[in-house]
Every structure is written in C-alpha cells, then in structure tokens.
Amino acid sequence: VGIGEAPVRDADHLSDYPFDTTTINELVDAEAAGDICGNFFTITGELCDTTLKNRIISIDIRDLPEHKRVIGVGGGEKKVRSILGALNGHYLHALITDVQTAEKVLELADNNTL
C-alpha cells in the first residue's frame, strides 16, 4: 500500500489531495500525519475522526493486519511522520523505503518528539 503524506494548510504548497479547503483544514486540525487508502491517521497511528471518512469508499485500514502480508511503500522527508504513524498504528507487516527516510523515522521515534 502507498503511504500518503500529511495534508498541509499552506497557500504556497499545492495539496496532493483533491479536497476543498474546508476538508484540508479539518484534516490538519485532526493532526493527520498521513493516509493509507484514504484513511487518515495521526502520528500515533490513531484514525482521524473527520467527516471525510464518511465520504470515501475504501478498505478500512484497521482490517489490514488481518491480511497475510501488508507492505507499505513510502519515502522522502515529507513521509517521515506518515510512515511513523502507519507503523505506530500496526497497519503494516513490512516497509519499503530508502535509508535516509528509515533513519529519520527511527530518529523521530527515538526522540519521542511526537
């Protein structure tokens, strides 16, 4: 599964998500760190309670651990918080990323700077 980065509320940054400003603001206010299959979660792995969850047709990522093998894919500086959230939520069995991103995820987890 792909691990999406956190939505941002920034006029200078175009969102990777096709959502209106109200939805982006709701996700930012809910402290969304990233998403898997349209399910947004915090850096601690908790699902974000937003109105968006009622408007997306997708697998419920809480069901992912029941599958034999769930492999997450993500890399780069912008994905560090989202990868850590996915790992904290126990949504993945394995992760494919680059060394630099893996080191930053471990550093963030070790520093308890959640």
Where does each model-flagged region fall?
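Conserved phosphate- and dinucleotide-binding cores of soluble alpha/beta proteins
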Residues: 1-114
